[in-house]
Curated annotation (Swiss-Prot):
This is Ribulose bisphosphate carboxylase large chain. PROSITE patterns: RUBISCO_LARGE. Substrate binds at N114, T164, K168, R286, H318, S370. GO terms for molecular function: magnesium ion binding; monooxygenase activity; ribulose-bisphosphate carboxylase activity. The basic functional RuBisCO is composed of a large chain homodimer in a 'head-to-tail' conformation. In form I RuBisCO this homodimer is arranged in a barrel-like tetramer with the small subunits forming a tetrameric 'cap' on each end of the 'barrel'. GO terms for cellular component: chloroplast.
Amino acid sequence: SVGFKAGVKDYKLTYYTPAYQTLDTDILAAFRVTPQPGVPPEEAGAAVAAESSTGTWTTVWTDGLTSLDRYKGRCYHIEPVAGEENQYIVYVAYPLDLFEEGSVTNMFTSIVGNVFGFKALRALRLEDLRIPPAYTKTFQGPPHGIQVERDKLNKYGRPLLGCTIKPKLGLSAKNYGRAVYECLRGGLDFTKDDENVNSQPFMRWRDRFLFCAEAIYKAQAQTGEIKGHYLNATAGTCEEMIKRAVFARELGVPIVMHDYLTGGFTANTTLAHYCRDNGLLLHIHRAMHAVIDRQKNHGIHFRVLAKALRLSGGDHIHSGTVVGKLEGERDITLGFVDLLRDDYIEKDRSRGIYFSQYWVSIPGVLPVASGGIHVWHMPALTEIFGDDSVLQFGGGTLGHPWGNAPGAVANRVALEACVQARNEGLDLAREGNEIIRKARK
């Protein structure tokens, strides 16, 4: 007979390959798969591998025109999740040739673009990705990184302090600038536009940039320290976003900001390249992350979004607090904090790290602890996050009964006291409250 056998085929015949030895150049993914009742895990795992690489539901004649063995994703290992019924961790290896160089957008479109609506699966979560050095080297990464940022700001040996200006919407540009000035004058290193401050009728972006720049220069002159305000350049188009970044550079301010998930990875990488070329630091807010990462069995874990950001580019990224008002488990949070900062991270399942990750000297990103934290959390934050971090107190600064500047003073005094106590060998976890009480005098 002519032709090939058509019809619906089991994915596992082609895409389940338990004998496969992964290559150093493969992108590896760990998926948490919950198959529909009656679907065997091998078939579910193979379906994920197929649909996120070369597969479709049947044999097509054009399969004969290429080498599936060279290009197909492979499900190479499956393990049941302890304590969960009918849930598996499925490991998939993708050949490097499937991905465009230097494009986080293309990487995500391939790996998570189509499989999440798949009928054979009840739920699917991407838990981790191993990005090989061969692919990492095609990305610029963060515009500057931790060390260059410290050198630009001339601030060493302690976490940096920030504050989100509240109320986040409704202030005029002039009053917004006043709030910025008071915080910086009191001793903070940075203040921040909230993620949804773009260019609204009550405060257009250009007015805000001008008044914030004035506040920065005034506070710098008064304190003798370098100050910054994260000017949110996020906009409706890439062109408008770059226009705002250009204006920030012309004002001579040190840092701009972007909402990387709502803005998108293409826009983010564009801005990161501009920032490196023009000496601007880039602060990244993760607005919308919980839509993607909050469900335990469906979506994408934040550690994957954090890795993607380090490739796409950003000097700071919000990464949870462990102690504040938003969700985050300590070991898991510290796992992706290390993924942001360190050059090499060892596989450690207790911290949710499924693969060892080598960043080949792509610069590190400062994790930002923000959300419901205040001065009494300072000892815990100093201990948990260490020096290479940004601690951001919004209400924890502006909520001070005497005003913004005293609120900023309180945070700076508490931070300096905690760092000094730690350097003197005191136990911050045990003696934290006492350290803060002493500093208050």
